[in-house]
Amino acid sequence: MRYQVTSVLCIGLILCFSIQPVEIYWCDVDIRFTESICGVSVVAFLMLMWRRQRIFLSAIDIIVALWFAYVMLRAYIDSTYPCANYILRVMQMMSLYVSLRLLFSSFQVSEKIVIFAILICAIYEVFLGADQMINGYSRHYLFTITGSFLNPGPYSVFLSMGLVMTCQMKKELYLGKGVVPSLVSYLPLAFLILLPATWSRAALLSAAISLGIIYRNQWKRWRWWGFAGIVIIVTVLYFLKQGSADGRSIIYLISLLCISHTPIFGSGIGSFCHQYAEGMANFSSNYPTFNFASADVTFNAYNCLLQIGVEQGLIGICLFVVLVSMTLIKLRKNTKILGTALLCLLIFSMFSYPFEQLPYQIICVLIVAYAANDVADSIFSTKWHIFCRCYIAPAVLCSAVVLFSIFIHKQIRERVRAESDYRMMAGVSHTAFIDDYYELLPLMASNEHFLFNFAKILAADGRYNDSNAMLRLGSLTSCDPMFYVIQGNNYGEMGFYKEAEAAYKKAFNVMPNRLYPLYQLMLLYEKEGNTKEMVDMAKRVISFDEKVVSPATKGLKKKAIIIINRNKQKNRK
């Protein structure tokens, strides 16, 4: 009994971090999470020693190890892009996986414990979201419901997962009679009521597909009506948020083009934003009549397969597909409830970015580690020496987790401190902070806001080459065209007009629905004294159909009109 309680406490401790407030950058939660992983691995190792249990190697373990080794090797061989944060997270998740494998090997944890632990987290998010709607507060001023997240998109995954898990549970398990079973039987309604409030099409679609699979036998005779209903619903959802859907279609198209350029090994870990900007620039210059109205700055592919394909190539995609397939097959045999939850999460990841959020990384690793814990599918289990399986292998794995945790803990603490220092001086753009920015640079090289602000401060101090160096570094981590616009400004200040012109044109090609790069080109031609190009660009600015009409864009067009009128007056004279 005590081992079961210990296992439940360890699982609960890990899952507690899936309901903590999610932040964009490193925070204290990540520090505590790393400490918890280390603690769980030590506890699991002691339980293994005390109970004299043996660990075994499964096929899932091999795929996980191969994928981890490939990512680490890929990042080591090609260090072009700042990817330290990504690698730290990968190491953290690998440490979590090994810790959970040790835990599940030390004691046979019931599937119900894992299921109810995840459901408790989902129910907590339901109460949190309902409280936000009732009391009118959330973590984003534009949305009424966000849960522990910064927007309702990722939050909706908890609701869709909770919905499909409870529906699968009602179908498979006999809950009995009484107050508690009755309450459990109505749990799907709690998730179903809040899910539409998130306005997440990906969550609705993933829930609908998962529920269709769960109840496939019941609706076989109505399948054509069901397909027709799905088509109608998808069409309605598309037109409700057409701009967003069109924008993601552009992201998918450019991502596929990026994969085609480096199909086998990908462009490198952490390369997506830069490759997306380069791909967009090439595509827009070759197809200028394409409708780019819905294009926008993005930091991910909104599709985990495409994200992996761009950075890791077909090798990464194959490892991901094999791992997912093996896990789903294993869960289908042993525990369909967890398999349904993972399937819902995977479907959602085809349209969004749940695997970039710590809560879903934790849940995914937990489910995969549980699926790998099947003695029937163990590899080399009879050939390993008993002493090795009982003592040496657990000791090596636990030591590796502890060493990884110490390294990760130190790195995250330094980055949390650097983020705190940057926030204190981010609102003050003064050249007195240049030395402080240089001191933080090694830890903040993947923070595009830090690099952009640093570049502006250097430019204000007249250090244009240093500013451009920071902007080039920023363009490796962001596809924001402003990194190229500021480079053009710096080149213009130094009198390098050809380089400035190239930078402005690159900025426009990266985001062809932005007016500002064309406006800067117009001013550059005016500064050069190139009247013909200036007038042509002014006319282009005036006729430009911008994505969002605002006082700023009206001001830019007004300036272009003034330039044209001034040129006409000069010609009359």
PLM feature segments, named:
Residues R139, I269-E311:
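Interfacial juxtamembrane loops and adjacent helix segments
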Residues Y437-Y438, L471, Y504, A538:
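Hydrophobic/aromatic packing residues within the alpha-helices of TPR/SEL1-like helical repeat arrays
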